[in-house]
């Protein structure tokens, strides 16, 4: 057994890191050594057993005599190997290592330095402003990184997040008050997101952020008896309070300004600027091409850019598979791509989860279309049986005071169709605003005649084969809806004990989460013997038909063949012996109610027990004696409890953790009821679906979901497909009555008396044949019920293409290429499409399934209207005020109490509303968030960063068009002319890599890889490097070099915009239309222009990349030195010292680029062995090149020396204090281990700072 030794101190951050890692290891694949999870020990290990003196915490012992590991980093890695982010050397793994190191060396010293003195755990002679400045400098890289990232390495917590969060626990608990947290907004958002994850909460509990009122003393650990304080201690505390008040005053000042010498982050400046609203006002009739002949606006405006393009695309037929070919059946060597949309419910509007689905599907569709494939993305909408009926019923009651029963079936259905026509277009409007390249001429609604015919055909065929059948079984029943509901429509509410819940139809709340015990008297017992049973649903005891005990339970062996007496009914209940009973739970005896519990039903089947239903469809009691007859079920609960007490049979009540099933539409408590329903036999179809994945005929990605697929298919149950609703596909089955005395009347559960038919005439002929009578003796009554919505949805890939008719679309596009959807409906929708498709056509409906993660809010919470975190994509596109968000809640169906709760949630998450981000930024951001995990914690505010990216594209293209000039003519091909400069070759090489990564990522459904490649190319390579190096070339006298640069620049724009187009269709179309064309016959729109292929862009150039890598390394070093010496407005000369002639030649070749990129003066390469000029600061660019930056004459050496000497004295004093503190008697024993580690890290940091100061002093002394 392995043991994890940790500190009991509540703020021991190294131990907390290990404990959280252990939690993640439990939830994942387990510890790195493959053994059992370790036991936790809240004390140091015995020194006699550890290989490292003194004992350090956390420490991990892998069994007696096994491997010992100590230290937070090593222990956490071993407990949670998956937290490393991937295999060594991968991008994620490198990022994890980087941030873990940063947390250990930068965050922990800064956090302790800022927090411990304030808590009185360490004295500090430093100015509190300087202490907070050090913390601010440590937080700055985090703040900038987290501006565009949810977590430090990927889209889920890793060991990097564990290390950084635990390092910052002290500041967030005791130092960073609300004003400070607003300064570090991104860090705060990330910190709160992390500590709300279940694994963090299990260890940390509820993390309370510092409110501004700090305790005067900090109690680190269990409370101890207070000792009398001496006069000296009281005097010392008074001084502490005085210093604390001064510290807090200075802290408030500090929080309003950046740390000394530090600039405000540029993104903050950009976010504070009001970009204004620029609109496109030229008169353009819908469907006509947008006029882009005028000048480009000064800055990017989503409303300007997105205007007019979509109607033109639609009018031109770019989204139709017929575009560019005579018909869809025409042979296409590039292949066919077909995908159908997961049909959204017609009930309302799309949210950000739908927007994620849409962004992924449209980017894939546009990529396939640009590759020249015959492409169809088919739109559609689902009638959403229960959801729609509930919404319209509420509307009807609110506006007319009528129920659907008062209105009647036909009139009610007319109201639903009317509502559908009024509201149904909103979803399609949203989809179009999202840029969805759907073929709208093929749009379908699941209640359309074409799709309804397919539903009827499927039901009739399956019924004729015996796959669909009629049976009486237990179903999930909503008494409020008066209908059976599917498993996906049942929410599971977990209770820890006694809880009062609101139930529709009851004025008072109902008690749940308790276990009631009562006694059944044994029949014929002379000793008044009884059997005690317990239940959470005491009202169901009126339906009890037996008591069950385990066959091996010795306590009840003497009761074999005996009965117990029901106290309220004239029947005795047999005592049955069944192995399902848990002997160790309660008394080991269980009441059996087959008509109201699934386990009891199965016991009843095994023992031939009667199933007595005691509730009608509305939840009122039936088949019971007065006074219980007719009582609502939860009124009966109280009445039964009173009656048991009156008869002396009540034995107790206790809290009981339980799960209450709730209907997610009506919020009613779901009851298991016996009802005759229609079922689908799924066994053989499930085996075929499972085998298709095993053989590889059907690929499910990510592959981790295949295990879930097989588990569901191997354990599938019969599918109940009937619903007691009016809105939906009415079941094409008819109950038969035969007007012939020779034929006895039938009963509902008897399947022989039910026939199906495509119409009533066909059903009548079937019935006449079945009973051997003439059709005129047959009376038919069609079933009032409708089919489960998932049944018609399961036929969607077939029905939209015209099945069962052999249409042209069916022959070309079935089976489809891909089904893309969220992993949460893998069983409810995907599995049923596969089963029905295979059964009805003998072919799979699609060849691949890609399952994306589920969108949650920035705090990891499920999207819920009552939390106020359900966001309309259009509100992100256009922006909305906080009041606007509130107004949406007022117009919803939420209860007033839920509205107030949702308002608070909106106020917390969007205090200033949601800024206008635009469609392109939203789509790109959602795809960038994608990871092959199960959840995405989406921070809407992060989308704004991608609007800034759009602005960068805009400005870069605007600059490029000026550089190209009005008379520029692109060369006929994109191939280089042979006279390109080093930086021209480099950017082409980087463009080649972006093209390779983009195509590779699309093929692998690795959307973050695609977005990262494109973002990096445009922002970090084209804008930050190439355009800067281009400026002197375009303004120079070398016309050959300038022309080569212009052709290369044009190629970068042309290829770069095509790369981005699937994600950002609007801004790329706008910019593309402003570029000159290589050929007059080029496609009219970017969306039908060929996507860049590696074969087209094969310009990989390792030599140029090595040269520019040296240039960029030198540039980074020069920029760092300029920042150190505050030379932001001066262009200092730079001298490069190289180790060999090859490096010298390379440095000489890139010196001009360094001059442009680093804003340097002269950039010269020193001869081998030549000394650098006096008065230079030195930095390393690589192991073969050093930079000497000329400071002589640019700074005042005497003044700088004075500042450095003072800094040196303070650093020496601080180092000496730390050495004395660590050398003090009892330090290893009395001081907490985490404080010792922080002191050690602080000493190392201070000594490194001293060495740097000494080097600077030596430099400036030479300059005097």
Curated annotation (Swiss-Prot):
Its domain of life reads: Eukaryota
Residue ranges for the region (Disordered) are 217-296
Residues involved in ATP binding: 865
Reactions the enzyme catalyzes: tRNA(Val) + L-valine + ATP = L-valyl-tRNA(Val) + AMP + diphosphate
**Intrachain S-S bonds:** none
By what means is the activity of this protein regulated?
Answer: Can be regulated by protein kinase C-dependent phosphorylation.
Per the Swiss-Prot or TrEMBL annotation, the motif 'HIGH' region is positioned at 344-354
Return the GO cellular component terms, semicolon-separated: cytosol; endoplasmic reticulum
Residues modified to Phosphoserine: 437, 527
Q: Tell me which residues bear N-acetylserine.
A: 2
Per UniProt, the ranges with Basic and acidic residues bias are 234-248, 261-275
Top EC category = ligase
Q: How does it assemble?
A: Forms high-molecular-mass aggregates with elongation factor 1.
Question: What NCBIfam families does the record point to?
Answer: PRK05729.1, valS
Descriptive protein name: Valine--tRNA ligase
The record lists the organism as Homo sapiens
């Amino acid at each position: 057994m392995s043991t994890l030794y940790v500190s009991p101190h509540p703020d021991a951050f190294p131990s907390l890191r290990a404990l959280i890692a252990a939690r993640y290891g439990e939830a994942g694949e387990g510890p790195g050594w493959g053994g059992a999870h370790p036991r936790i020990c809240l004390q140091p290990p015995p020194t006699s057993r550890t290989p490292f003196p003194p004992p350090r915490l956390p420490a991990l012992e892998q069994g007696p005599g096994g491997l010992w590991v100590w230290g937070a980093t090593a222990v956490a890695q071993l407990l949670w190997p998956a937290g490393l982010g991937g295999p060594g050397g991968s991008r994620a793994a490198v990022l994890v290592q980087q941030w873990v190191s940063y947390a250990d060396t930068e965050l922990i010293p800064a956090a302790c330095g800022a927090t411990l003195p304030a808590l009185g755990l360490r004295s500090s002679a430093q100015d509190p402003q300087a202490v907070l400045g050090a913390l601010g400098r440590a937080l700055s890289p985090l703040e900038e990184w987290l501006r565009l990232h949810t977590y430090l390495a990927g889209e889920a917590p890793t060991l990097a997040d564990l290390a950084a969060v635990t390092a910052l626990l002290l500041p967030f608990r005791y130092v960073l008050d609300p004003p400070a947290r607003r300064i570090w907004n991104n860090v705060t958002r990330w910190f709160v997101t992390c500590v709300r994850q279940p694994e963090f909460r299990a260890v940390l509990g509820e993390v309370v952020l510092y409110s501004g009122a700090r305790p005067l003393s900090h109690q680190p650990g269990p409370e101890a008896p207070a000792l009398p304080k001496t006069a000296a201690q009281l005097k010392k505390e008074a001084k502490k309070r005085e210093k604390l008040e001064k510290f807090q005053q200075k802290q408030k000042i500090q929080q309003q300004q950046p740390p000394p010498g530090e600039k405000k982050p540029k993104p903050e400046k950009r976010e504070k600027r009001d970009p204004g609203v620029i609109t496109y006002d030229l008169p353009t009739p819908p469907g006509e091409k947008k006029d882009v002949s005028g000048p480009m606006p000064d800055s990017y405006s989503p409303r300007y850019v997105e205007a007019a393009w979509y109607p033109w695309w639609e009018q031109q037929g770019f989204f139709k598979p017929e575009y560019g070919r005579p018909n869809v059946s025409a042979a296409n060597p590039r292949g066919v791509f077909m995908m159908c949309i997961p049909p959204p419910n017609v009930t309302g509007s799309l949210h950000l989860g739908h927007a994620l689905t849409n962004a992924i599907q449209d980017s894939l569709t546009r990529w396939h279309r640009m590759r020249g494939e015959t492409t169809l993305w088919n739109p559609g909408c689902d009638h959403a049986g229960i959801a729609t009926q509930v919404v319209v019923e509420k509307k009807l009651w609110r506006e007319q005071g009528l129920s659907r029963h008062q209105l009647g079936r036909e009139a009610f259905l007319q109201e639903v169709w009317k509502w559908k026509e009024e509201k149904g277009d909103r979803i399609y409007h949203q989809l179009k605003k999202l840029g969805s390249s759907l073929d709208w001429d093929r749009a379908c609604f699941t209640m359309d005649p074409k799709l309804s015919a397919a539903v009827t055909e499927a039901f009739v065929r399956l019924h004729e084969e015996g796959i669909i059948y009629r049976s009486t079984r237990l179903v999930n029943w909503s008494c409020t809806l008066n209908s059976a509901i599917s498993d996906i429509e049942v929410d599971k509410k977990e209770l820890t004990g006694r809880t009062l819940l609101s139930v529709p139809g009851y004025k008072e709340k109902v008690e749940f989460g308790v276990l009631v015990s009562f006694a059944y008297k044994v029949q014929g017992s002379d000793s008044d013997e009884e059997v005690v049973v317990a239940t959470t649903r005491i009202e169901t005891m009126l339906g009890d038909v037996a008591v069950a005990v385990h066959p091996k339970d010795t306590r009840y062996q003497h009761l074999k063949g005996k009965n117990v007496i029901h106290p309220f009914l004239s029947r005795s209940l047999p005592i049955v012996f069944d192995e399902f009973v848990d002997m160790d739970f309660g008394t080991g005896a269980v009441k059996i109610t087959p008509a109201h519990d699934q386990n009891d039903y199965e016991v009843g089947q095994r023992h031939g027990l009667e199933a007595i239903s005691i509730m009608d469809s509305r939840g009122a009691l039936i088949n019971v004696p007065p006074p219980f007859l007719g009582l609502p079920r939860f009124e009966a609960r109280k009445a039964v409890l009173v009656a048991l007490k009156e008869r002396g049979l009540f034995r107790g009540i206790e809290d009981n953790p339980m799960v209450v099933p709730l209907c997610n539409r009506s919020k009613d408590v779901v009851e298991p009821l016996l009802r005759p329903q229609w079922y689908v036999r799924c066994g053989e179809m499930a085996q075929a679906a499972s085998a298709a994945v095993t053989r590889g005929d059907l690929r499910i990605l990510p592959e981790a979901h295949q295990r879930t697929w097989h588990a569901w298919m191997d354990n599938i149950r019969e599918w109940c497909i009937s619903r007691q609703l009016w809105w939906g596909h009415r079941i094409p089955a008819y109950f038969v009555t035969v007007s012939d005395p020779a034929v006895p009347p039938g009963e509902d559960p008897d399947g022989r008396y039910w026939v199906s038919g495509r119409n009533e005439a066909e059903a009548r002929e079937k019935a006449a044949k079945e009973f051997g009578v003439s059709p005129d003796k047959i009376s038919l009554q069609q079933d009032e019920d409708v089919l489960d919505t998932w049944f018609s949805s399961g036929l969607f890939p077939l029905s939209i293409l015209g099945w069962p008719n052999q249409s042209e679309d069916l022959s070309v596009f079935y089976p489809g290429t891909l089904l893309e959807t969220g992993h949460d409906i893998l069983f409810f929708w995907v599995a049923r499409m596969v089963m029905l498709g295979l059964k009805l056509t003998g072919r799979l409906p699609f060849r691949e399934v890609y399952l994306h993660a589920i969108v949650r809010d920035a705090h990891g919470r499920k999207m819920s209207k009552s939390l106020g975190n359900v966001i309309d994509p259009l509100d992100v596109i256009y922006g909305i005020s906080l009041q606007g968000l509130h107004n949406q809640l007022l117009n919803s169906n939420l209860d007033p109490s839920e509205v107030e709760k949702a308002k608070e949630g909106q106020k917390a998450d969007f205090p200033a509303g949601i800024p206008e981000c635009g469609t392109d930024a939203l789509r790109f951001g959602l795809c960038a968030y994608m990871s092959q995990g199960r959840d995405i914690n989406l921070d809407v505010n992060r989308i704004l960063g991608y609007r800034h990216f759009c602005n960068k594209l805009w400005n870069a293209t605007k600059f490029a068009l000026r550089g190209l000039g009005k008379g520029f003519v692109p060369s006929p091909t994109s191939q280089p002319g042979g006279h390109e400069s080093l930086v021209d070759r480099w950017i082409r090489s980087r463009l080649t890599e972006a093209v390779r990564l983009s195509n590779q990522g699309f093929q692998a459904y690795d959307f973050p890889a695609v977005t990262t490649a494109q973002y990096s190319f445009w922002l970090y390579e084209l804008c930050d490097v190439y355009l800067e190096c281009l400026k002197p070339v375009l303004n120079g006298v070398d016309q050959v070099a300038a022309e080569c640069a212009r052709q290369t620049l044009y190629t970068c724009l042309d290829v770069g915009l095509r790369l981005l187009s699937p994600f950002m269709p609007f801004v790329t179309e706008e910019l593309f239309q402003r570029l000159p064309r290589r050929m007059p016959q080029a496609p009219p729109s970017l969306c039908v222009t060929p996507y860049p292929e590696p074969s087209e862009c094969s310009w990989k150039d390792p030599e140029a990349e090595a040269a520019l890598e040296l240039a960029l390394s030198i540039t980074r070093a020069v920029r760092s030195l300029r920042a150190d010496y505050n030379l932001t407005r001066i262009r200092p000369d730079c001298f490069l010292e190289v180790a060999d002639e090859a490096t010298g030649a390379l440095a000489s070749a890139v010196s001009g680029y360094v001059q442009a990129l680093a804003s340097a003066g002269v950039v010269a390469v020193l001869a081998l062995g030549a000394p650098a000029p006096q008065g230079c600061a030195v930095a390393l660019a690589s192991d073969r090149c050093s930079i000497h930056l000329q400071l002589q004459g640019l700074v005042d050496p005497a003044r700088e020396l004075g500042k450095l000497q003072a800094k040196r004295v303070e650093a020496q004093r601080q180092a000496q204090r730390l050495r004395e503190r660590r050398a003090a008697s009892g330090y290893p024993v009395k001081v907490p281990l985490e404080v010792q580690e922080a002191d050690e890290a602080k000493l190392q940091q201070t000594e490194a700072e001293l060495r740097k100061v000494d080097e600077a002093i030596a430099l400036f002394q030479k300059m005097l």
